[in-house]
Amino acid sequence: MEPQRRELLAQCQQSLAQAMTEVEAVLGLLEAAGALSPGERRQLDEEAGGAKAELLLKLLLAKERDHFQDLRAALEKTQPHLLPILYLNGVVGPPQPAEGAGSTYSVLSTMPSDSESSSSLSSVGTTGKAPSPPPLLTDQQVNEKVENLSIQLRLMTRERNELRKRLAFATHGTAFDKRPYHRLNPDYERLKIQCVRAMSDLQSLQNQHTNALKRCEEVAKETDFYHTLHSRLLSDQTRLKDDVDMLRRENGQLLRERNLLQQSWEDMKRLHEEDQKEIGDLRAQQQQVLKHNGSSEILNKLYDTAMDKLEVVKKDYDALRKRYSEKVAIHNADLSRLEQLGEENQRLLKQTEMLTQQRDTAIQLQHQCALSLRRFEAIHHELNKATAQNKDLQWEMELLQSELTELRTTQVKTAKESEKYREERDAVYSEYKLIMSERDQVISELDKLQTEVELAESKLKSSTSEKKAANEEMEALRQIKDTVTMDAGRANKEVEILRKQCKALCQELKEALQEADVAKCRRDWAFQERDKIVAERDSIRTLCDNLRRERDRAVSELAEALRSLDDTRKQKNDVSRELKELKEQMESQLEKEARFRQLMAHSSHDSAIDTDSMEWETEVVEFERETEDIDLKALGFDMAEGVNEPCFPGDCGIFVTKVDKGSIADGRLRVNDWLLRINDVDLINKDKKQAIKALLNGEGAINMVVRRRKSLGGKVVTPLHINLSGQKDSGISLENGVYAAAVLPGSPAAKEGSLAVGDRIVAINGIALDNKSLNECESLLRSCQDSLTLSLLKVFPQSSSWSGQNIFENIKDSDKMLSFRAHGPEVQAHNKRNLIQHNNSTQTDIFYTDRLEDRKEPGPPGGSSSFLHKPFPGGPLQVCPQACPSASERSLSSFRSDASGDRGFGLVDVRGRRPLLPFETEVGPCGVGEASLDKADSEGSNSGGTWPKAMLSSTAVPEKLSVYKKPKQRKSIFDPNTFKRPQTPPKIDYLLPGPGPAHSPQPSKRAGPLTPPKPPRRSDSIKFQHRLETSSESEATLVGSSPSTSPPSALPPDVDPGEPMHASPPRKARVRIASSYYPEGDGDSSHLPAKKSCDEDLTSQKVDELGQKRRRPKSAPSFRPKLAPVVIPAQFLEEQKCVPASGELSPELQEWAPYSPGHSSRHSNPPLYPSRPSVGTVPRSLTPSTTVSSILRNPIYTVRSHRVGPCSSPPAARDAGPQGLHPSVQHQGRLSLDLSHRTCSDYSEMRATHGSNSLPSSARLGSSSNLQFKAERIKIPSTPRYPRSVVGSERGSVSHSECSTPPQSPLNIDTLSSCSQSQTSASTLPRIAVNPASLGERRKDRPYVEEPRHVKVQKGSEPLGISIVSGEKGGIYVSKVTVGSIAHQAGLEYGDQLLEFNGINLRSATEQQARLIIGQQCDTITILAQYNPHVHQLSSHSRSSSHLDPAGTHSTLQGSGTTTPEHPSVIDPLMEQDEGPSTPPAKQSSSRIAGDANKKTLEPRVVFIKKSQLELGVHLCGGNLHGVFVAEVEDDSPAKGPDGLVPGDLILEYGSLDVRNKTVEEVYVEMLKPRDGVRLKVQYRPEEFTKAKGLPGDSFYIRALYDRLADVEQELSFKKDDILYVDDTLPQGTFGSWMAWQLDENAQKIQRGQIPSKYVMDQEFSRRLSMSEVKDDNSATKTLSAAARRSFFRRKHKHKRSGSKDGKDLLALDAFSSDSIPLFEDSVSLAYQRVQKVDCTALRPVLILGPLLDVVKEMLVNEAPGKFCRCPLEVMKASQQAIERGVKDCLFVDYKRRSGHFDVTTVASIKEITEKNRHCLLDIAPHAIERLHHMHIYPIVIFIHYKSAKHIKEQRDPIYLRDKVTQRHSKEQFEAAQKLEQEYSRYFTGVIQGGALSSICTQILAMVNQEQNKVLWIPACPL
């Protein structure tokens, strides 16, 4: 509003408010004009009388907009007589009742004087200024001025007309209306005031009447409620009366029964008295008879008669006594029942009284209602009286008006008044003249204004058009605004992200500032150094001049060298040819020398140890400190503990355990580097902390002296110059590494001839490729114009001799030098400089390029696999009978290797070099497989033993990277001459991963290498962090071997599942029969003691085992071909049965059948300790090797990783089946071995069940974790082969399939079948029956076979998800399990037999009966199931074999994880069948014996231990994640012994306690309990033990119920209600603490540390509880010591403490009070609560509790309709039993009873709303939350908490809560909320403090969003 108008309105505010009468009309017009908002109108309506007008004017003055015109228009329409007050600030009385009424004086008195008139007229628009208008006026001002003038003109015209009338009346003496003017009578004013008062009273009475009507309606409603309540109470009372009558009738009946019983009792008593009398009579008769006749016979007869009668009476008496006792018992029961009924009657009487009281209360309320109705009638009567009085007052007012008319007529008669009128007339004339003059001025001004109005109208039209355009622009701007709003939302999110980034950047800034300070210090030091450098610069300049002259000379020499390049190439080719010839000539001599040295080395093991130092090299590594506060993480490596926790058993050195890729240490340090010194600090016998201290204390650079394995292969950097001659493409394809992937034929690179596929490219045109990506390298190749200079890294295998450089290497070196000289010194120097620039470490013993191989590559050069080994080429391998190699394979290319070859999983090199580290891969396109095919290397390195050597050579290569070999032809194993003892035992060649402790007594035909074994304390890989001892008992079974002439020491020591797989002091090596996979590249794999195998495992390989499972001398170098990683599954060490096919076995042979074949008995050693007295055990023997310990630190690999073992050893091992080492049918012809990996689904199709090559069940299991590689095929020669032949044939074997999940048979089924059937010798083959009762019976995700188990299913409303069928011999079986169903989640499997269902026996039920039983509706289902898949399978799948192993009935489904029998070949993989005639009965029996022994070993067994001490002496590992395993058994333990526990045993039961899902701490506590003897059920499962060993074995989540502040660094601090993830309950064997992770809101791990265990905290609570009891007993007389008050807790809540010192001391003990820790209930832990993680993908329902629920829900739905939706209640007309049954069946959540129906909340409606992506607002009672939890629905429960009922009453909202909450209603809601909070607070997700409704809704929205994004934790089973 303009200031002038605001001032004018403020001046006349009071007078205008007093004069305004029709306020309601004015308000209506103002509201219609938009001057008043609805809220202001409601505010004005609340006011009454004159205050309303005054408030209206105040509101108008307070508004910013100008509503003055609206007020003027409203007054003009309703009360025009008030306009002078508005404009002239005058005081005008009420309007006259008629025109011309009133005296002339009163009219004229209201008119202003001349001065006032002029001033008031001139003040319109401009107050206090001249009347002339301003020169420039706006359109709005002009319009307002025109309107004001027109109003004033109308007023003046009206006044003029009235004055004319008065003037005429004064002149003529009469008025125009014939009525004289009279002054108002004072009584009229008084009556008018009384009338106004009466009208106000009438209005108040109307308001009271309205309120009374409302109250009456409320009372009527309450009356209806109480009527219904009364009727309900009456019905209850009637029912209770009926009950009482019924009870009375029952009481009367009982009384009648009591009377009858009492009467019968009296009859019985009377009969008893009669019987007594009769007995007395009989006695009297007897005495008389005795007196008269003393004959004994008569007496005896009488006596007998009496006794008979007595017996009859006694029986009757007993029957009656029994009946009497029963009646008495019935009577007592009736009495007790009568008493109960009496008590019930009393209770019902009390209830009736209560109901009567309630009825009386209702009657009182009814009386009150009647009184209120009477009161209402009285008020109505009073209202009628007031109306009558009002009519009387109106009649009196009319009389007064008539009297007023008479008074006016008398007034005219007075002469004095006429004189006055004349005088007044003169004054009026003068004023009229003045007004007319002013009117002329106004008219002139109006003319001017008219012209201005026309201009304004034209402007208005233009402004209208502009307004339309502006509206269009506004609409566009509105759209832009919407988009901007959306962008603003996105921007807010981005701002939040940027805020977080800003925080991180701030932190980085702080660190950068700190680093800047450090940099300043360094800068000062740099300035000092710069001065020194400046001084040295001058001297360097002179040196630079000299170097420049030398460079010019070198450039000229380079030009000369390039000119002679062609001649040099020709010379190179000639020298290469000569070199090949020299190689072939020197090989035989070198092999003889090597073999001689090897045999000489056998006499002393010390020689191997002395040469150990030749495998090591010392290197100085330097790091540049970037900052002062550097740590291991910044350097990018980690180290082992050292002395405190040795990385390897017996070796306390500090080793590098991890090197981060891309870090500072990458390329400088390697895994398993031995740190000798750091910054001149000796680290011998130091621990990790001291090493870190030495690392951090250094200033400037960090110098490390490390010791590592030498890389003994020769590596050469060969420069290559390619002349592109205008061609754009060089023809070279690269792959990650950087390696040459392919060379395009005819390209410039192919024409040069020196570049081969697999060569590593170190530099391009002098630019090092060390840190360049593949794209950058390719761009460098493309950027070359005319010429291309490459630096190639070629790796050549070193000779197997340890005696220095031999002739072959000298020739090779000469070849290198030729290559270097051909390319000139400048390129070499340039490449060398580039290499040095990218590697700061200084190596002392090897060439620069050795470090290039250490860099990790992203993948192998030959394929897309990300694993660090190369696939073997796809070409087949053939074995040729030639004894000498051809020259075609002796080229450098056959020895060529690429740098990626040194990055295997820690493989042991074939040539006796150091084991290849994990970040090295084997060099060469063929990897180890190809390199091992070279005679000079593979034969030399793998020689030893007495096996007849196979002289190997190569044939033509049909395709790239394919090698063919054939072994030497040998006699058939069926030749009877082979059973004769040869004079000279043939040599056996072994390729084991470690040096054997025993040696061959005869020299080999070729010289083998003299590679010493590696130190027994080193390991070169961190891929597998478990340690393995190599000795323990063996469960191997070997049946059908030849007469043993070898010592037990010839047996291959394998990873014994009985030993703990963790670091332990080195023990003497113990050997056993096993065929296991040794860790690749494990440092200890090269020196395992005497790993001599008697079998070959066909389950995972038919080729590579040849390179691993051979006996060889202890000093022979170990060989480990690259294999696919498979964790050792000792569970699948399955002993097989092998029986000879004919009766040629001598008794001696049968006697040695269980033992391993070997060499002559003169090499045997005494056994280390006696083995188990059972068939199939192998005697232990002490090997000649020194004490060693095998440390398993690598994954285990199978042949399917595309590495073919060296064929230098007999290839017969490739075909040795797991059942024996006999020649199988499949090996009689040329077969094809498919070594490709297959998926799990493929495995089921590759199950071989044919003849003697049938695999064990564990060998046929598919594994989803196996690696996928390219398929390769290996040709098997037709020559019958066998792994070893010492004296005669060895056909017995043990198969220990050792893969994480048993692999498939690599043999093709079709090929095997056709070949086996086509062989004529098939009938002579022994039948191999596989023992099906292996540990393979239980897969990781499968239950134990034939072991009943309880399965609990929380069914709810969902289907079970299984299909059932009836067995052939009865029983109900699960034929299908739907994946993801609740049955699948609960653990039901295909093949489960359902024994019981909720306690109902189904063992003999039919399928129809079972379906009826299973179809019953219930919340929780308990099923007793037994895993018997074979019982159902045997009846539905036929077998094609003529003979089945009887143990085959125990076979299990060992498929690839399918739960339905979709693959018939998978149904019974353990059933074996014969292709030829069946085995003779004698042979069958022996195989059954072996199978039974095998079954006894691998099935769960029961161990009885007599506990003579507190501890069993058993070390445990694992936990509830994988199971609790026996890690170690102490020597003095009662569990030690042949029938005791062995490491690797999985504890299934301890006593009567099932420990399958127990933590290791719980099992440990159970073992500590005092017992005389204990029964354990265990199962030997080494493969899972290998996984569980060394890793945390427990896994569960807990909620902390107290606060804890860590005192030590290793401990974990947490707060109450924090979620912790416990992964180790017995860390390092320490009881009393747990290792746990602290989790954030998203269940992500934050920090790991140590926390007190549950048992420790329970003891703490018990102690405190006892202390508090002592406090209560002693009250204030005692105070507890400070030690008793110590705890792990920190007080979170403030307790009310008393003022006394004793009270303060005692209250400090209340840390377990109810506000912080729950109370004791059913042995629940007070410290921790076990919880379960639930991922809520759908939106969770919302349940709001507290006062004003409906209003809040309505507001949420209206304000956020896309987020919330109320759950609709379904109206159901059904019986209450049906509704409750629906609740029980989880169909309904809750229901409310209405009149005649039920309002039901269903689960389907909740899910329907959830599926719409909305939160469902539930309307259920709090007790239904538990039902929702059972249905796996977890609502967000929000409680609205108000401080008092007054706050509830004060809540108002203009839209959602218009009516004020009454006092009673608010009090009831508050009390109900308090009760609800007290009873159900444990379910509350959050509590919101009550306030304004909008604030509550905002808080609910925020809380719902927060809780929806949180991870949900629900209570699980108690700890």
From Swiss-Prot:
Q: Which part of the chain is the SH3 domain?
A: 1593-1661
> Which InterPro entries is this protein grouped with?
CARD, DEATH-like_dom_sf, DLG5_N, DLG5_SH3, GK/Ca_channel_bsu, Guanylate_kin-like_dom, MAGUK_Signaling_Regulators, P-loop_NTPase
**What positions does the domain Guanylate kinase-like occupy?**
1722-1905
Listed Pro residues bias regions: 1045-1055
**Regions annotated as coiled coil:** 383-599
State the GO CC annotations.
Answer: adherens junction; cell junction; ciliary basal body; cytoplasm; glutamatergic synapse; plasma membrane; postsynaptic density
What is the topology of this protein in the membrane according to its UniProt annotation? Answer: Peripheral membrane protein
Any idea which residues bear Phosphothreonine here?
T984, T1011, T1183
Stretches assigned to the PDZ domain: 620-710, 705-796, 1350-1429, 1501-1582
Q: Which domain of life is it from?
A: Eukaryota
Q: Which GO terms describe its biological process?
A: apical protein localization; cell-cell adhesion; epithelial to mesenchymal transition; epithelial tube branching involved in lung morphogenesis; establishment or maintenance of epithelial cell apical/basal polarity; glial cell differentiation; intracellular signal transduction; maintenance of cell polarity
Q: Which disease is it linked to?
A: Yuksel-Vogel-Bauer syndrome: An autosomal recessive disorder characterized by multisystemic manifestations including cystic kidneys, nephrotic syndrome, hydrocephalus, limb abnormalities, congenital heart disease and craniofacial malformations.
Family, as annotated: Belongs to the MAGUK family.
- Please give the record's comment on domains: The guanylate kinase-like domain interacts with the SH3 domain.
What functional role does this protein have?
Acts as a regulator of the Hippo signaling pathway. Negatively regulates the Hippo signaling pathway by mediating the interaction of MARK3 with STK3/4, bringing them together to promote MARK3-dependent hyperphosphorylation and inactivation of STK3 kinase activity toward LATS1. Positively regulates the Hippo signaling pathway by mediating the interaction of SCRIB with STK4/MST1 and LATS1 which is important for the activation of the Hippo signaling pathway.
How it assembles, according to the record, is: Interacts with MPP1. Interacts with CTNNB1 and with the third SH3 domain of SORBS3 to form a ternary complex. Interacts (via coiled-coil domain) with MARK3. Interacts (via PDZ domain 3) with STK3/MST2 and STK4/MST1. Interacts with SCRIB. Interacts with CTNB1, SMO and (via PDZ4 or guanylate kinase-like domain) with KIF7.
This chain's protein is named Disks large homolog 5
Organism of provenance: Homo sapiens (Human)
